Amino acid sequence: SGKPVLHYFNVQGRMESIRWLLAAAGVEFEEKLIMCQEDLDKLKNDGLLMFQQVPMVEMDGMKMVQSRAILNYIATKYNLYGKDTKERLLIDMYTEGMTDLYELFFKVILAPPEEKDAAKSLIKDRAKNRFLPAFEKVLKSHGQGYLVGNKLSKADILLTELLYMVEEFDASLLANFTLLQALKTRVSNLPNVKKFLQPGSQRKPFPTQEMFEEMRKF
């Protein structure tokens, strides 16, 4: 049924985790980037966006929307979603926690200038004292190379994506979390992920405030 087609802006945003997951699963995909208002209007007018918003992924004969639903479909299809309901619960719990931290990065971009420092301080505090210790503890108590079971899952891939984001924001935040550093290295060295991390891949830049302002006009 051909390659999946991803419809989104030329930034990370809510599509980047989908790009990571497809890449890790070894699935080649195409992108139709939304570069102007007309591109988005066409998708809407053609009735392709259920809720009039992106991301949207064309895959297996479907027009899929809502990023978490898309991620769950891909994870299920490519056996990255645990072996039973208990493992799926853990994967969901962990990825929802990642989303909570991920959302704080968007708040920094959207914060007015006088609130940016406070928003950055909040990320540092939450990363260092809440989220990263929780994931480090999971790896330590689980005693395996991965977060759930002894097998790569959606949770490991999305955590690796998040760790790159944290590192780019402030590398010192990862200093005390040796198991998270090891997980990041392990996942990054998987052949499909390694390829995705090379320059010239379909990875996207983290959005600047200017990019966000442009996208919000649409």
Swiss-Prot record:
Residues 84-206 form the GST C-terminal domain. Glutathione binds at Y8, K44, Q53, V54, Q66, S67. GO terms for molecular function: glutathione transferase activity. It catalyses: RX + glutathione = an S-substituted glutathione + a halide anion + H(+); prostaglandin A2 + glutathione = prostaglandin A2-S-(R)-glutathione; prostaglandin J2 + glutathione = prostaglandin J2-S-(R)-glutathione; (13S)-hydroperoxy-(9Z,11E)-octadecadienoate + 2 glutathione = (13S)-hydroxy-(9Z,11E)-octadecadienoate + glutathione disulfide + H2O. It is found in: Cytoplasm. Keywords: Acetylation, Cytoplasm, Transferase. Residues 2-82 form the GST N-terminal domain. The modification N-acetylserine is found at S1. Glutathione S-transferase that catalyzes the nucleophilic attack of the sulfur atom of glutathione on the electrophilic groups of a wide range of exogenous and endogenous compounds. Involved in the formation of glutathione conjugates of both prostaglandin A2 (PGA2) and prostaglandin J2 (PGJ2). It also catalyzes the isomerization of D5-androstene-3,17-dione (AD) into D4-androstene-3,17-dione and may therefore play an important role in hormone biosynthesis. This is Glutathione S-transferase A.
